[in-house]
Amino acid sequence: MVKIFQHPLINAKLTTMRSKETSYKDFRDNLNEIASLMVYETLRDYQTKKISITTPMNVKYEGETLDREIVIIPILRAGLGMLNGIMNLVPQARVGHIGMYRNEETNEVVEYFFKIPEVPHDSYIIIVDPMLATGSSACDAIAKLDKLGFNNIKLVCLVGVQQGIDKVTKQFPNVDIYLASKDEKLNEHNYILPGLGDAGDRIFGTKIK
């Protein structure tokens, strides 16, 4: 399943992020706010379990609590920019990290770090990365988690293009993809157009090449 959000709050915040005049701080703030809005919908099919509690009025109440582990896995480094927004909404979630970068000469994905919590294989895994461009980083991350036996993986990105969507859905048809926007295309350097620019540079205030 591919879900592209249509929500006025997300659209307005995303427009702010797209502007080259937006400061690093405002870029980060809007990214976290959009991530919070997106994870709300991403967790819609999460299965809870029934529990019994007593209210301050000494009344028994049959309610719900989270049943399975939720693990947020940002793809470094840009995925870190979405983490706080999600953790504000799901503070009990655990966090893993996958470090990848793209070799600018070969466009190949290079992994340099991988660490995730020891959790059951039916845990709810949410991979986050602002950009879904060629889909190579996402597929490499999903493949590694799939090989470890995780069977409930979702991919949450701000913007993506058809090329990346097709690559992920072809290799991993059971992985749901959530996007704030589907953009037009990639340029000759595999950057998304109209896009956001280099999300990592804009999050962390590093020099934009």
From Swiss-Prot:
Q: Which InterPro entries match?
A: PRibTrfase_dom (IPR000836), PRTase-like (IPR029057), Upp_B (IPR034332), UPRTase/APRTase (IPR050054), Ura_phspho_trans (IPR005765)
For the ligand (uracil), the binding residues are 192, 197-199
What residues does 5-phospho-alpha-D-ribose 1-diphosphate bind to?
77, 102, 129-137, 198
Keyword Nuclease listed = no
Q: What is its EC number?
A: 2.4.2.9
**Biochemical pathway:** Pyrimidine metabolism; UMP biosynthesis via salvage pathway; UMP from uracil: step 1/1
Catalysed reactions, semicolon-separated:
UMP + diphosphate = 5-phospho-alpha-D-ribose 1-diphosphate + uracil
Which GO molecular function annotations are given, in alphabetical order? GTP binding; magnesium ion binding; uracil phosphoribosyltransferase activity
The record's cofactor note says: Binds 1 Mg(2+) ion per subunit. The magnesium is bound as Mg-PRPP.
Family label? Belongs to the UPRTase family.
Question: PANTHER family, from UniProt?
Answer: ADENINE PHOSPHORIBOSYLTRANSFERASE (PTHR32315), URACIL PHOSPHORIBOSYLTRANSFERASE, CHLOROPLASTIC (PTHR32315:SF4)
What name is this protein filed under?
Answer: Uracil phosphoribosyltransferase
- Provenance organism: Metamycoplasma hominis (Mycoplasma hominis)
Annotated gene: upp
